[in-house]
Amino acid sequence: MSGTGRQFRVARAVISPQHPGMIRDKEKPAPTKPGKGVIAVAPPSFRRERALLKRGVWPVAGCDEAGRGPLAGPVVAAAVVLDPKRIPKGLDDSKRLTADKREQLFEQICATAAFAVAYASPARIDRDNILRASLWALAKAVHALPEMPRHVFVDGRDKIATSCDCDAVIGGDGLVLSIAAASIIAKVSRDRLMCRLAEDCPGYGFENHKGYGVPEHLAALDRLGPSKHHRRLFAPVVAARQKHQPETATVPAVAADLFEFGAPPV
């Protein structure tokens, strides 16, 4: 949302002429109450999935990732196929939910939907760059589903390499219910994993900031230097590495990845 004070709501989806595989939502000003600067945001819907189901196209998956921005830990991607008859209530973009609500919905999604999780390790991120590593993990998650979907909706601007049809939806975690479910699975899986990494590498506060570059984390990096779970080519990590390890260190090979794909942490 811009800082101009105008509020928007989704009107309808259109195909972006610049990127035919990408769906962009046309927007129009939404009414606001006088003197109010915040309005309720409509939750994601199941209409795209339902439209495909009516045409006989099923399974339909949504996929999303968590952890592009942190300085440490993997990118975690999830793919979810919701059961149209057992959709958990309250699904939304994981960023709009409290941690407790995410945990609650995580368990409900796992109990009612088909899902898969994939991990792109810091070593892969350093080798391939964060975007390519994220797209790789998203594709791995889709192909790890119990049944290959016939159509996939992915959050963002970029389609992923799959053997089925794929649409990229900008802001998809707030628009498409299956993507919202995937955002919850990815976020909770990654948060749980970072708490485990905090036990493996104490002192960095991974359990608190989940690897993001907050002051607590930057101070620990400066004090302790990078851990084996840090992304060695991210600028703050490079600076800390130069301070603690002045010699040039090689980037670990992808073959040594700690995480590839599998069940989410418990």
Swiss-Prot record:
Disulphides: none
List of residues binding a divalent metal cation: 64-65, 155
Region (Disordered) residue spans: 19-38
EC number in record: 3.1.26.4
Main location: cytoplasm
Cofactor note: Manganese or magnesium. Binds 1 divalent metal ion per monomer in the absence of substrate. May bind a second metal ion after substrate binding.
Keywords: Cytoplasm, Endonuclease, Hydrolase, Manganese, Metal-binding, Nuclease
Subcellular location: Cytoplasm
Record has Manganese as a keyword: yes
Protein name: Ribonuclease HII
Lineage, broadest ranks: Bacteria, Pseudomonadati, Pseudomonadota, Alphaproteobacteria, Hyphomicrobiales
